[in-house]
A protein has these predicted regions:
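Glycine-rich phosphate/diphosphate-binding loop of Rossmann-like nucleotide-binding domains
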Residues: 1-40
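Short beta-strand segments at enzyme active-site cores
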Residues: 38, 61-66, 98-104
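Glycine-rich phosphate-binding loop
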Residues: 46-87
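Short beta->alpha junction loops
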Residues: 36-46, 105
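Short, ordered loop/turn segments at secondary-structure junctions
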Residues: 11-12, 68-69, 103-107
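C-terminal binding/interaction regions
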Residues: 77-132
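General structural feature for long, well-ordered alpha-helical segments within catalytic domains
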Residues: 4, 16, 20, 24, ...
Length: 132
C-alpha cells in the first residue's frame, strides 16, 4: 500500500522551493509513495496550522514540511526554527503520524540553501519509512 503524503511548503523563496518540491516528488515516487496534497504557506511561522490539518486528514499518512529560514541580522530565524521544531514534534506525537523536516536553516546563507535542496528528499524518505 502506498504511503500518502501531504507537503507544507513556504512560498517566500519560491524558486528554491519549486526545486525542493520537485526533489520531494522524485523521492516519493522512488519510495512508492504519493504526494496527494501540497499547501503553500507564507513561511515557517504559518506552517503549524497546515501541518495539524494534514495530520488530521484521514487520507494522508504523513506530512513533510519544506522551507528555508535564511540568515538574518537578528535571532528571529533561530526563534522561528526552534519554535516550529517543537510544535511539529508535539503534533507528530499527538496524531501518531510522521512529520518530515525539510527545512533548510535557520541561519543558512543563499549558497548553503542551494547546496541543501536534497533536504526535501531526505524528509520524504524519513516520513515514508516512519509511516510504514
Amino acid at each position: 500500500e502506498r504511503v500518502r503524503l501531504g507537503v507544507c511548503i513556504g512560498e517566500f523563496h519560491n524558486k528554491l522551493m519549486d526545486r525542493m518540491l520537485e526533489d520531494a516528488r522524485v523521492s516519493a515516487e522512488a519510495m512508492g509513495a504519493t504526494i496527494d496534497k501540497v499547501v503553500w504557506v507564507p513561511g515557517t511561522y504559518e506552517a503549524p496550522l497546515v501541518v495539524e490539518n494534514m495530520l488530521q486528514d484521514p487520507t494522508l499518512d504523513a506530512c513533510v514540511v519544506l522551507g528555508y529560514i535564511e540568515k538574518g541580522s537578528t535571532l528571529h530565524g533561530q526563534e522561528m526554527g526552534a519554535t516550529f521544531s517543537i510544535i511539529a514534534k508535539q503534533l507528530e506525537l499527538e496524531y501518531g503520524k510522521p512529520v518530515g523536516m525539510g527545512i533548510i536553516g535557520p541561519g543558512a546563507t543563499a549558497e548553503q540553501a542551494e547546496m541543501r535542496v536534497a533536504y526535501a528528499g531526505n524528509a520524504v524518505r524519513a516520513s515514508v519509512r516512519m509511516a510504514r
